[in-house]
Amino acid sequence: MTNTRKSHPLIKIVNHSFIDLPAPSNISAWWNFGSLLGVCLGLQILTGLFLAMHYTADTTTAFSSVTHICRDVNYGWLIRYMHANGASMFFIFLYFHIGRGIYYGSYTFMNTWNIGVLLLFAVMATAFMGYVLPWGQMSFWGATVITNLLSAIPYIGPTLVEWIWGGFSVDKATLTRFFAFHFILPFIITAMVMIHLLFLHETGSNNPSGMNSDSDKIPFHPYYTIKDILGILFMMITLMSLVMFTPDLLGDPDNYTPANPLNTPPHIKPEWYFLFAYAILRSIPNKLGGVLALVLSILILMLFPILHSSKQRSMSFRPLSQCLMWMLVANLLILTWIGGQPVEHPFITIGQLASVTYFFIILILMPSTALMENKLLKW
């Protein structure tokens, strides 16, 4: 009699994905972030579901309902802060996961990579709409500023913005639809994650050497299940420390003031995980140019497989490319810092330089350095 795990139509799929999956024997902790992102997504859906039970998507009561969750609902404060800080953890892991993909050349799995970039866009859209829901000052003005960017689209722009708003400004209709989209998108993301995994399992995982590992595979369970559990443990310790001790560390104090269309906050800025893109947007003095740069700063990830000019897949044995990779990381940290600063000298100039450098490293320096490394190795 065959094992149920291997014969049952549904359990068989789980078995091939998480139990008997052949995995490279040398994948490092950088490969933990996929499972951590999965746990984050599950946690966000779960906490979000409980928040939605008590939240009201109406301009007059939204802010009060969030206050009610924190004050009156059993462990409401815990659920709310786990959801808010869980989003921050989600983005930290996303950026590590993408960075890992760039460093080790995982982007050569074209299908997996492209669906991953689409996933990034979907998660960013979800996070943005979630930030609008508490209906604080930064929620309202963030929504106003970001949706207004669409007015830069030639010809259809202004009509498009009013269509998204459901009126002539960000109001009740906007909040209601943002709540609807914020609720449905995580489930669409879950479906996309399944496609992401489907494409990954077609090829098998990459590994730090960037070489074919078919000759040395080990079963996913117990080796990588236990490794993932350790990663999840570290994640939960970090998340719960953040939630219990400094829940508002990554938030904006302005969002504790109810939304007021008649009073603009002195510095409108998004959550920390969007600051690098916001800095790129602000560094261009033209509205349409800024919007294009903003979209391209993420969409540029799609170009990595095309721009790959090295004969080696991974950066493990390419010191010059490694230097550029860490330059890119430093550059993104500078952009994140600039995105949170007011628009004045010297921040404007630093932001413009960092924005140009970002595109220059990816589009010119990385491919040309890879070609130079090929030459140095006489390939």
Swiss-Prot record:
Identify its membrane topology class: Multi-pass membrane protein
The places in or outside the cell where this protein is found are: Mitochondrion inner membrane
Q: How is the cofactor bound?
A: Binds 2 heme b groups non-covalently.
Cysteines engaged in disulfide bonds, as pairs: none
**Gene Ontology MF terms:** metal ion binding; ubiquinol-cytochrome-c reductase activity
Keyword presence, Mitochondrion: yes
* Any GO BP annotation: mitochondrial electron transport, ubiquinol to cytochrome c
Which parts of the chain span the membrane according to its record?
Answer: 33-53, 77-98, 113-133, 178-198, 226-246, 288-308, 320-340, 347-367
Q: Where does heme b b566 bind?
A: 97, 196
Which residues bind heme b b562 per the record?
Answer: 83, 182
Q: Could you tell me the superkingdom of the organism this chain comes from?
A: Eukaryota
Q: Which InterPro entries does UniProt cross-reference here?
A: Cyt_b/b6_C, Cyt_b/b6_C_sf, Cyt_b/b6_N, Cytb/b6-like_sf, Cytochrome_b, Cytochrome_b_C_euk/bac, Cytochrome_b_N_euk/bac, Di-haem_cyt_TM
* Residues annotated for a ubiquinone binding in this entry: 201
Which cofactors does this gene product need?
Answer: heme b
Question: Which cellular components does GO assign to this protein?
Answer: mitochondrial inner membrane; respiratory chain complex III
Protein family according to the UniProt entry: Belongs to the cytochrome b family.
Record text on subunit structure and interactions? The cytochrome bc1 complex contains 11 subunits: 3 respiratory subunits (MT-CYB, CYC1 and UQCRFS1), 2 core proteins (UQCRC1 and UQCRC2) and 6 low-molecular weight proteins (UQCRH/QCR6, UQCRB/QCR7, UQCRQ/QCR8, UQCR10/QCR9, UQCR11/QCR10 and a cleavage product of UQCRFS1). This cytochrome bc1 complex then forms a dimer.
Protein role: Component of the ubiquinol-cytochrome c reductase complex (complex III or cytochrome b-c1 complex) that is part of the mitochondrial respiratory chain. The b-c1 complex mediates electron transfer from ubiquinol to cytochrome c. Contributes to the generation of a proton gradient across the mitochondrial membrane that is then used for ATP synthesis.
Stated name of the protein: Cytochrome b
